[in-house]
């Protein structure tokens, strides 16, 4: 008796997620060929389409294994299967050309050079030995070279580089790790490096290997070189050369702001900073962010110039993430050269990173002594990402850009197609539809035409790559923000204007997957946010969900002399705080001594008559004021300088002193602020709020200073006082509302000491604490909150 014949079946499988440009089709091909199945795989605008045919058991095995071990850069977010009629085909499984059709897929971020490519780079016997653009399906640029979707070479900035026969063979071989690697190249087919010296430097232009050798020699000689990377230009110099670092700092007008440092390898990084296992993992990850680390007190064999990160216990380190970086820092056998380089964004302070080659020669003229450039265009600017690692091993991203963008975030509620324009500082837009949101790259400040042009370019690029056509715009409520005016010009009708601190809280809620059915206690501390009453907010505790909020507590307002321009003068902020608290400007007080007699007279008149003095409840401004009062920072050369110096001082006394300065916590009726929101059934909403009055803090601080208490102790006691005030108010709120989830958000919570202490006190009190992780707590994460508030309105209307 013969066994029954098993009829073949055919199954159509659609895979969604980050599945293009990552070697997913060769992976599918190997699976199918290993099971002797027939059919095909193809890229489409929706993801990857597979049709597979063969014995039912083998087709089932194929489907089961499909998501078990995908390529390293792949992320599968959805798999759809349906049976279709078998065709009776018997040929081999094939990889078909990409289908051109409307739809959406996910492009991976740019990733660091993989170990296999690094081995080829260093191997004299390999045809890509010292090739500055070596890459494969497991590494290299993606987002910054993509000009459209689906992701194929014609839709990248590699379209102008025809493949040589050898590269074409690799590109077409499913068994090769360069199969359909769109940026694949070699010395024969380009791109090519070039070194362009500044006029009068006495150095001749060079190409290829000579360009790299000349750039290394210039860096070793103390020169500043503009280096074109994947997402823009860096300005580089030898980080151990005090004169070179001082020159770069002076040319860039950077004040005392710390520089990031690129180390040749992990061993070098370990000599400069103390690394935990989690910090080591972040530093060596494919994302290759800048990681903020504790500096070693006595570095082993490598000493950074003092001006790299002056007066800071931390240093931002990153490792090479392109072959150009690896070659600049030197391969074994190369002539001696710097093993640590300052790598700072190629721009003047306050401007966006430069990406265009012609612009680089003009905008960076006077900053760089030479340009190490290449002829592969950059489709979108993408600055380095920045993060710190908490003691528990979790990450707090402070700038979300290269290595993260355009990876989508999963949303807890569906949103209408919406574009949120963020804020004017640390600008990053957010585009969303359905249950996904995409951040654009970090743009920075929108204070000039270059910043606005970069934001518009980022918007066009992200819209093109995601396939989202926004129908709604969301923006900050501040009427003077460039980002708000930009939203009004998008042609999407009147933008939905979202209060600044409500957006911060909504951003954290979305990151943690909260659906908003239960409000949270949102602690939103920053320097500046436009308040409902037209004043400057920033020391806020709100009851909030996505539909609205109620202002529960605030920092006692004080005048902000000169408005936004006064922020650069912490000494004036300090004196305004003393004035608001009824405390005298005593001779010998650091903030008084920092001002001229004329300045003091004008400031006194301003405060008395209320001239150009907008009230502010900004917690960030209080940190600035205290920094001046203890004698640390009176004139800020960059954003948050005063607060950073205060945190650095507090760190040195943190374990030795456990004191805390007490805030006055008083009930306040008519606190003002809020929008209609859905009060949960059975929950009470406080009719009145509280005020956090810093007058007792200031009195205690001045008393301790008169007793010659060390500045670090003063700083530590202030930090603990803020944390205890927050914990006290959150406990009171729980007692009155029954709410138990607290969100910590806003730029002030980038302060590691404050965030850790506040979270610890709240956790001890039995409250659930949500902190930012992949989404920045500062204005770099603002657009996600705007998106959620505006984009979910239709969802809430149907409930």
Task: Go through each PLM region and give its residues.
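Intrinsically disordered, low-complexity, mixed-charge
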Residues: 1-183, 187-194
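A contiguous, well-structured pocket-lining segment that forms one wall/lid of small-molecule binding clefts
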Residues: 190-191, 424-453, 457-459, 576-615, ...
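Short glycine-rich phosphate-binding loop at a beta-alpha junction
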Residues: 226, 467-479, 737-748
């Amino acid at each position: 008796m013969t066994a029954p014949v098993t009829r073949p079946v055919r199954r159509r499988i659609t895979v969604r997620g980050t599945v293009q440009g990552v070697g997913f089709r060769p992976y599918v091909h190997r699976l199918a060929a290993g099971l002797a199945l027939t059919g095909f795989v193809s890229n489409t605008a929706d993801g990857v389409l597979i049709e597979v045919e063969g014995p039912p058991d083998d087709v089932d095995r194929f489907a089961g294994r499909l998501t078990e071990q995908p390529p390293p850069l792949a992320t599968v977010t959805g798999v759809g299967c349906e049976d279709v009629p078998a065709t009776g085909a018997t040929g081999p499984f094939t990889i078909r050309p990409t289908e051109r059709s409307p739809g959406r897929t996910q492009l991976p971020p740019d990733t660091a050079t993989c170990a296999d490519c690094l081995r080829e780079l260093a191997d004299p016997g390999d045809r890509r030995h010292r090739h500055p653009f070596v890459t494969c399906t497991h590494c290299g640029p993606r987002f910054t070279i993509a000009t459209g979707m689906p992701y194929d070479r014609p839709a990248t900035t590699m379209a102008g580089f025809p493949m040589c026969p050898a590269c074409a063979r690799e590109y077409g071989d499913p068994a090769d790790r360069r199969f359909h690697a769109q940026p694949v190249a070699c010395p024969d087919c380009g791109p090519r490096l070039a070194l362009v010296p500044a006029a009068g430097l006495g150095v001749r232009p060079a190409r290829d290997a000579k360009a790299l050798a000349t750039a290394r020699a210039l860096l070793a000689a103390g020169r500043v070189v503009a280096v074109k990377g994947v997402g823009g230009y860096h300005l580089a110099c030898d980080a151990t050369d005090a004169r070179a670092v001082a020159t770069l700092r002076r040319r860039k007008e950077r004040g005392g702001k710390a520089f990031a440092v690129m180390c040749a390898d992990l061993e070098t990084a370990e000599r400069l900073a103390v690394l935990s296992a989690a910090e080591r993992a972040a530093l060596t990850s494919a994302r290759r962010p800048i990681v903020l680390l504790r500096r070693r007190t006595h570095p082993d064999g490598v000493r950074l110039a003092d001006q790299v990160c002056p007066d800071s216990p931390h240093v931002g380190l990153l490792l090479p993430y392109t072959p150009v970086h690896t070659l600049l820092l030197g391969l074994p056998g190369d002539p001696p050269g710097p093993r640590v380089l300052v790598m700072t964004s190629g721009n003047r302070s306050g401007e966006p990173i430069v990406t265009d080659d012609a612009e680089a020669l003009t905008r960076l003229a006077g900053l760089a002594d030479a340009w190490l450039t290449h002829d592969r265009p950059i489709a979108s600017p993408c600055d380095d990402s920045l993060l710190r690692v908490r003691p528990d091993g979790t990450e707090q991203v402070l700038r979300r850009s290269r290595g993260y963008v355009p990876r989508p975030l999963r949303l807890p509620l569906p949103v209408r197609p919406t574009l949120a324009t963020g804020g004017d500082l640390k600008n990053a837009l957010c585009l969303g539809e359905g249950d996904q949101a995409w951040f654009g790259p970090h743009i920075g400040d929108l204070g000039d035409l270059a910043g606005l042009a970069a934001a518009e370019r980022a918007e066009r690029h992200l819209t093109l790559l995601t396939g989202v056509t926004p129908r709604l715009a969301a923006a900050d409520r501040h009427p003077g923000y460039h980002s708000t005016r930009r939203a009004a010009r998008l042609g999407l009708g009147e933008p939905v204007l979202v209060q600044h601190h409500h957006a911060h809280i909504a951003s954290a809620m979305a990151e943690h997957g909260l659906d908003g059915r239960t409000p949270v206690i949102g602690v939103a501390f920053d320097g500046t946010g436009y308040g409902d009453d037209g004043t400057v907010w920033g020391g806020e505790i709100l009851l909030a969900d996505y539909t609205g909020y109620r202002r529960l507590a605030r920092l006692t307002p004080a005048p902000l002399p000169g408005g936004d321009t006064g922020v650069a003068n912490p000494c004036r902020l300090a004196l305004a705080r003393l004035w608001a608290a009824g405390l005298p400007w005593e001779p010998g007080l650091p903030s008084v001594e920092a001002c001229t007699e004329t300045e003091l007279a004008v400031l006194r008149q301003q405060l008395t008559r209320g001239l150009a003095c907008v009230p502010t409840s900004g917690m960030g401004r209080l940190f600035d004021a205290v920094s001046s009062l203890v004698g640390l920072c009176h004139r800020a050369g960059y954003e948050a300088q005063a607060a950073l110096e205060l945190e650095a001082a507090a760190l040195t006394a943190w374990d030795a002193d456990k004191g805390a300065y007490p805030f006055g916590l008083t009930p306040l009726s008519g606190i003002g602020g809020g929008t209609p929101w859905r009060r949960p059934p059975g929950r009470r909403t406080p009719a009145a709020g509280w005020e956090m009055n810093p007058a007792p803090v200031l009195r205690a601080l001045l008393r301790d200073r008169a007793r010659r208490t060390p500045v670090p102790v003063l700083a530590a006691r202030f930090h603990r006082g803020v944390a205890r005030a927050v914990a006290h108010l959150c406990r009171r709120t729980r007692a009155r509302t029954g709410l138990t989830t607290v969100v910590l958000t806003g730029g002030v919570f980038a302060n590691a000491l404050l965030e850790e202490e506040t979270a610890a006190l709240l956790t001890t009190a039995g409250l659930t604490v949500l902190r930012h992780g992949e989404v920045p707590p500062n204005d770099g994460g603002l657009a996600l909150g705007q998106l959620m508030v505006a984009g979910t309105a239709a969802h809430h209307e149907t409930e």
